[in-house]
C-alpha cells in the first residue's frame, strides 16, 4: 500500500516537472513571436498618427517617458520622437482624456512641434456602444478630422464641438465623449510645442521601470 502511494506520488511529481518544463519551453519559443507582433502593431499605429514621409528615423527606438498634468493624469506617458536627418520634426504622444462619459479614454496623438496635429487614434476606451464609440476609427472617421488642424493657443475656441462654437462635430446623443477627446488632443498638441527643449533631459522608455 505504502509502496503504491509512493509510486503514485513519484509519478505525479515527474508529471508536474514535465509539464512545467514544457510550459517554460513553449513560453521561450513564443515570446519572440509575441514581441515581434506587438512591435508591428505599434509601428502600424505610429504610422497612422505621424506620416512616414515626414521623417527618416526609427520612432520606435526613440521613446521617452513624460509626466505632465496636460496629459490628463499623473501617470507616466510615452512619447516617440520622429527625426528628419537628425532633427526632431514631430512626435507621437500617449495622452489621456480623463473625462470621458464612461471613464478615461486613452489616445495616441501625433503632432509637429508647432501645434499642427498630424493624426489621432484611440487606443482604449469604455464609451457606450452606438454612441460614444464613434471615436474609434473602425466605426467612424470622426477621429480623422483632427489631421491637419492646428492649435493656435490655449484660448483657441475653435477646439470645441460645433454646438459650443467649435469646428468639430458632436455625436447624436453624445457630447461628453467628443468634447473630452477634443480637449485632450488640444492639450497634447500644446504640450508637444514645448517638448524639443526637453528631449535631452527625458528618461528613455525602460529606464527605472
Swiss-Prot record:
TM regions (residue ranges): 9-29
Show the GO cellular component annotation of the record. Answer: plasma membrane
Cofactors, names only: FMN
Residues bearing FMN phosphoryl threonine? 175
Pfam family name, one: FMN_bind
What molecular function does GO assign, one term? electron transfer activity
- Name the UniProt record assigns to this protein: Ion-translocating oxidoreductase complex subunit G
Amino acid at each position: 500500500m505504502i509502496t503504491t502511494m509512493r509510486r503514485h506520488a513519484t509519478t505525479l511529481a515527474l508529471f508536474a516537472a514535465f509539464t512545467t518544463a514544457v510550459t517554460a519551453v513553449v513560453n521561450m519559443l513564443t515570446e519572440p513571436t509575441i514581441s515581434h507582433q506587438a512591435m508591428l502593431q505599434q509601428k502600424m499605429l505610429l504610422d497612422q498618427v505621424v506620416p512616414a514621409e515626414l521623417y527618416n528615423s526609427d520612432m520606435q527606438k526613440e521613446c521617452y517617458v513624460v509626466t505632465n498634468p496636460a496629459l490628463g493624469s499623473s501617470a507616466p506617458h510615452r512619447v516617440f520622437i520622429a527625426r528628419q536627418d537628425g532633427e526632431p520634426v514631430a512626435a507621437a504622444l500617449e495622452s489621456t482624456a480623463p473625462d470621458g462619459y464612461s471613464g478615461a479614454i486613452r489616445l495616441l496623438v501625433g503632432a509637429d512641434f508647432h501645434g499642427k496635429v498630424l493624426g489621432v487614434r484611440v487606443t482604449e476606451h469604455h464609451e457606450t456602444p452606438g454612441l460614444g464609440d464613434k471615436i474609434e476609427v473602425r466605426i467612424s472617421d470622426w477621429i480623422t478630422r483632427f489631421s491637419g488642424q492646428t492649435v493656435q493657443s490655449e484660448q483657441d475656441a475653435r477646439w470645441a464641438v460645433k454646438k459650443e462654437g467649435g469646428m468639430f462635430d458632436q455625436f447624436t446623443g453624445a457630447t461628453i465623449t467628443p468634447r473630452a477627446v477634443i480637449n485632450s488632443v488640444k492639450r497634447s498638441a500644446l504640450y508637444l510645442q514645448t517638448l524639443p527643449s526637453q528631449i535631452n533631459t527625458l528618461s528613455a522608455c525602460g529606464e527605472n521601470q
